[in-house]
Amino acid sequence: MKKIFSLVLLGIALFTFAFSSPALAADSVNGAKIFSANCASCHAGGKNLVQAQKTLKKADLEKYGMYSAEAIIAQVTNGKNAMPAFKGRLKPEQIEDVAAYVLGKADADWK
């Protein structure tokens, strides 16, 4: 019985680790610095100067399917429409940090 319990706990731990979000390990403080240097010219305060309806506010991120670290990472990495790709300009870890920062600010309504 003890062996089964241990195996179940191990399975839960492995499952949790395997499917954890990359934003959990990201550094939102570093993300704030990177955002300020690379993103704030168009997205200051969570706004969008190019497409005003597509802000970085939580409701808009949810509406447009962007309220996840994975979606933000893909957008920042590859760009889309008027937004440039940052794949060659930022390291993957830096992009993860930006995603963590954006999600944190969206949850706090950019205050």
Curated annotation (Swiss-Prot):
Job of this protein: Functions as an electron carrier between membrane-bound cytochrome b6-f and photosystem I in oxygenic photosynthesis.
Compartments where located: Cellular thylakoid lumen
Q: Which cellular components does GO assign to this protein? A: plasma membrane-derived thylakoid lumen
Q: Which SUPFAM superfamilies match?
A: Cytochrome c (SSF46626)
Q: Name one Pfam family in it.
A: Cytochrome_CBB3
Q: Is Membrane included in the keywords of this UniProt record?
A: no
Gene coding for it: petJ
Alphabetically list the UniProt keywords.
Electron transport, Heme, Iron, Metal-binding, Photosynthesis, Signal, Thylakoid, Transport
Q: What is this protein called?
A: Cytochrome c6
Say if the entry is tagged with keyword Electron transport.
yes
Biological process annotations from GO: photosynthesis
The UniProt similarity line reads: Belongs to the cytochrome c family. PetJ subfamily.
